[in-house]
Amino acid sequence: GRLETGMTLPAGVHDLAQTVQQGERTVTIHPAAVETPTGVVLVDVGYPGELDQVEAGLADAGLALGDVRAAVITHQDGDHAGALAELVDRTGVVVYAHELCAPYVDGREHPVKSPEDQRYEPVDVDIELVDGVRFRTAAGPMDVVFTPGHAPGHVSLHFPDSGTLLAADALTADESGLAGPSEEFTLEIEDALDSAERLAERDLR
């Protein structure tokens, strides 16, 4: 698969691009499926009510929802964590999120960018992540990189063997490649710029 930057993903990592209408705008987001020795790990799950698009993306990769064993949520926003409740109901996946993100996912805190009267359905976080946690995958190690700024407890995922980065919203991307964080959508811009510098120190290809 390919992400919006045109970056080629290593074998075992698949782009699950999801397109939704947001009023007048058409928005495309990029959950990913990562194959591991014990099943598929989803990195983010997309909008509420759009799990069928995740299923379709998995099918395009020769995978199925029944292959999914875990979901790693990069941060609390509804376009990344919104479909979690439906996913857990249907598959019983293990949910991972950073320790500072977990309260927003599980309902102890209200998602910081959601209106007070609405949020996606809360879901228990089974395992709370910290910086440096490593997953074994078909594409080699997948390392959790703590990248706060855009949202509390934001993480990115780095594959050192291929130099691949799933930045989530720590960076922005367009046709010309990766760029720094978007000030418009970032809670703590100084933290976000520090996070971008940390990512820049990694081997990215």
Show which residues each predicted segment covers.
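Well-ordered beta-strand scaffold positions
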Residues: G39, L100, V133, G140-M142, ...
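Divalent metal-coordination and catalytic microenvironments
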Residues: V34, D44, V54, H75, ...
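Conserved beta-strand hairpin/beta-sheet module of binuclear metal-dependent hydrolase folds
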Residues: E4-A61, S156-A168, T172-A173
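Internal catalytic-core helix/loop-beta-alpha segment
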Residues: D126-A139, V144-P148
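Active-site HxH/HxHxD metal-binding segment of metal-dependent hydrolases
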Residues: G49-Q53, G57-R134
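Short Pro/Gly-enriched beta-strand edge/turn motifs at strand-loop
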Residues: L9-V20, V112-D117, A138-G140
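Metallo-beta-lactamase
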Residues: P48-G49, P141-P148, P152-R205
